[in-house]
């Protein structure tokens, strides 16, 4: 509503602030209603999927919903190799859709990993993420779930503005994410970006469509992601 309609139908209103994180914007509704803020994300609960590894493992979620949020096949393989070299079983997650499965078949062809794509419900996925030593994924819902589950989370961001849509760390966000930085960290979340002058553009890829590539992601170096991954893993699993 706006103008006279807002006054006619709403007892109280707050102005939309599109410059703050979306979680913070929603928490402001609680302030207006006099409800104490709870900045902790409550994730679904469920048991581990039957095929979950018994030893230490890492989770990679390589397939976002849209092409313009995809990284590179070579990048994902490099990260998986780095995790395996640190003694971690690599678990690949993903949805059941045909296009997503085809992309993951391409990414993980010939790889010695545990594939759980299409085999976890949300509760099982949440439990899996809570047990993982580290999670690496693009800007997608599972990345936000990993952050909420308390997993050390490495998020690969391209066109999306982390100031508005960055993963929300356990315990809340102590200060705003920067628009662009090679690596930035708050709590259990690390955001990795390739610093193009146009990043973050908030557009659907360089060709302005869901199926286009984003140069800021395609040029994101595996070494940069692996460096953030090592920070997230901590000293005991670094090389």
Features from the language model and the residues they span:
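Catalytic machinery of carbohydrate-active enzymes
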Residues: 1-239
């Amino acid at each position: 509503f706006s103008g006279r309609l807002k006054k006619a139908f709403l007892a109280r209103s707050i102005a939309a602030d599109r410059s703050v994180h979306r979680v913070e914007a929603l928490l402001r509704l609680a302030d207006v209603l006099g409800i104490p803020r709870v900045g902790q994300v409550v994730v679904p609960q469920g048991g581990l999927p039957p095929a979950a590894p018994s030893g230490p493992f890492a989770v990679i979620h390589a397939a976002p919903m849209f092409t313009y949020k995809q990284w590179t096949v070579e990048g994902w393989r490099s990260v998986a190799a780095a995790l395996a070299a640190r003694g971690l079983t690599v678990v690949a997650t993903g949805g059941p859709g045909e296009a997503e499965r085809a992309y993951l078949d391409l990414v993980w062809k010939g790889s010695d990993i545990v594939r759980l794509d299409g085999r976890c419900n949300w509760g099982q996925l949440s439990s899996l993420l809570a047990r993982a030593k580290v999670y690496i994924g693009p800007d997608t819902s599972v990345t936000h779930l990993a952050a909420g589950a308390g997993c050390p989370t490495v998020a690969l961001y391209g066109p999306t503005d982390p100031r508005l849509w960055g993963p929300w760390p356990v315990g809340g966000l102590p200060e705003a994410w920067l628009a662009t930085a090679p690596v930035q960290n708050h709590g259990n979340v690390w955001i990795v970006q390739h610093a193009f002058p146009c990043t973050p553009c908030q557009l659907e890829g360089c060709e302005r469509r869901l199926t286009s590539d984003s140069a800021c992601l395609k040029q994101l170096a595996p070494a940069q992601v692996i460096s953030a991954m090592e920070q997230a893993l901590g000293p005991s699993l670094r090389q």
